[in-house]
Amino acid sequence: MAVVDVVRRGREGCCRDLLADGPQTAVELARATGLHEPSLYRLLRSLTGFGVFTEESPHRFALTPLSSTLKTNDPSAGRELVLTQQWVSRAVAELPRVMASGETGMQLAFRMPVFEYLTQHPQQSADFNRTMTAFAAAELHAVAEAYDFSGAHRIVDVGGGTGALLATVLGRYPLVSGVLFDRPDVIDEAHATLTEHGVTERCEAVGGDFFESTLPSGDVYLMSHILHDWDDDRCAAILRNCRKTIDPKGRLLIIEMILPAGDEPHPAKMFDMYMLVLSGGMDRTAEEYRELLHGGGFRLTRIVPTQSPVSVIEAVPDLDGA
């Protein structure tokens, strides 16, 4: 989803024209346009990160010099847009209906959730996994350098994809073992990564469903770019499943971008729109993660920044709430 595409589709909701008379809240704009207010708020918030709107106070938006000059009939708007995956393009094209209904672009375009679509389309799934691996490559060493894993014994990477992050951590900590857990079709592609990093003797690869399956036991659970794929209820289900098997003295490490408060530019604001369109998930603020973890039986202990857009959110089992 290119910025120009979000800007163009945001203007289709007439927000620019409505804000021409002065700042308004997301609730007021939703009422005037008939759009789904939570989805509209997230769209407007994402655009503040690129100077299109400004959030003058919580949930209250105003025009910037950039949005004041946008022309709704400009034929060149969005002409540089390049979407490399056709199925993603189709989902993004549903953004106006997403804004009106609150459904995902995948549901509107394909009548199925994104991960069901990927399961049914192996080639698209393989391309998607390679794209995610390439995207996360810059984060791998940043996470491994920022967080001290030396006290870990057995790391379980929940939804770990092809294993690049876990393999990187195990490569730095030769006394630590690991378990890579993901869908069986994803695990099939992970063996090459584990072999390449020389960690196959210390790392199991287990297929399953992190909603339903009994997770492998461990003292450190790792989840990288998992929770942002899901809404709060589904995240709580994942966290509760982790809580069942994690060591009572263990740690849960969540690798995600954290949304800043206000209109500070941050890439998480744009990726939040991807989540809205593709999966119905969301990127979250630190306080939202704190509340989410509490609902899943964990207590947030600290947030460790890295030399990349992501942070390591550390949590421990909430023994008082057990």
Predicted regions and their residues:
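Alpha-helical subdomain
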Residues: 1-49, 54-57, 66, 149-322
